[in-house]
Amino acid sequence: MLLTTAWCLLIWSVTLLLVRICLVIPIFHSSREAGPLTKDKDNVGGRMKNLVLFIFLGSGGHTGEMLRLIEHYQGMLLESAVTIHVGYSDDDSIIKFKNKIHQISVSNTLRAKVIYHRFDKARDVGSSLAGSIKSIIKTAIRSMVLTYRIKSSMRGHPNLTLLNGPGTCCIITFWLKLYHIFLWQPSKIVYVESLARTNRLSLTGMILYPLADEFVVQWADLLPIYPKAKYYGVLV
């Protein structure tokens, strides 16, 4: 009798967990809500008052695309935010971001508090398989606390996590979705695929395609292949 009860509880718990996962992971359901990245910036910006924004700066070209993206949507993203969390993994990226913020703040009043978080790189280009696995595990462990702090600050506020970069974005998304599933702390994750991806997604893009709440491509030719994606033209 006791064994039967235990099995019933286990089956019930697993069923509830699977239902919860299906409700949280976007690939299992279709959202009819308007996406945050749209040409109607004024309308969307009004719906995102007191926004808590989290962006991650990948290195090199990823950082350049992210800076152009937030400049293009600065009214909706920066000027609507009360807190901006900036994740980065190299010093050059954060210097470029601070310079861009300074340029924007000269002509606009930014009331947001900016908080910087240094993440380890998930992997270095050219590293071996063993080295990559070790680096990914280390980054995942260290990212757990950082993402929880960011997630906690989003509680009670409209929030947006904007990603466009390397493998670290996968780790960030993993933790944010895990907290959503088990701690009931939702977050809106938007991934913008690189402009360089004209025919197929990057490896990060393929991993995040089923996980991101909104997946944005910058070439219309990708839409028939990835029907869940959204296209707003060239954003960067």
From Swiss-Prot:
- Might you report a single GO cellular component term? nuclear membrane
Q: Please, one GO biological process term? A: dolichol-linked oligosaccharide biosynthetic process
Name of protein: UDP-N-acetylglucosamine transferase subunit ALG14
The topology of this chain with respect to the membrane is: Single-pass membrane protein
Give the stretches traversing the membrane: 8-28
| InterPro entries recorded | Oligosacch_biosynth_Alg14
Task: Explain the purpose of this protein.
Answer: Involved in protein N-glycosylation. Essential for the second step of the dolichol-linked oligosaccharide pathway. Anchors the catalytic subunit ALG13 to the ER.
Q: In the UniProt record, does the keyword Acyltransferase occur?
A: no
Highest taxon of the source? Eukaryota
Subunit composition and interactions: Heterodimer with ALG13 to form a functional enzyme.
Q: Which UniProt keywords apply?
A: Endoplasmic reticulum, Membrane, Nucleus, Transmembrane, Transmembrane helix
Q: Where in the cell is it found?
A: Endoplasmic reticulum membrane; Nucleus membrane
Which segments sit on the Lumenal face? 1-7
> What is the protein's major site of localization?
endoplasmic reticulum
Cytoplasmic compartment segments: 29-236
What GO molecular function annotations does the UniProt record carry, in alphabetical order? N-acetylglucosaminyldiphosphodolichol N-acetylglucosaminyltransferase activity
Organism of this sequence: Kluyveromyces lactis (strain ATCC 8585 / CBS 2359 / DSM 70799 / NBRC 1267 / NRRL Y-1140 / WM37) (Yeast)
Stored Gene3D superfamilies? Glycogen Phosphorylase B (3.40.50.2000)
- What does the similarity note say? Belongs to the ALG14 family.
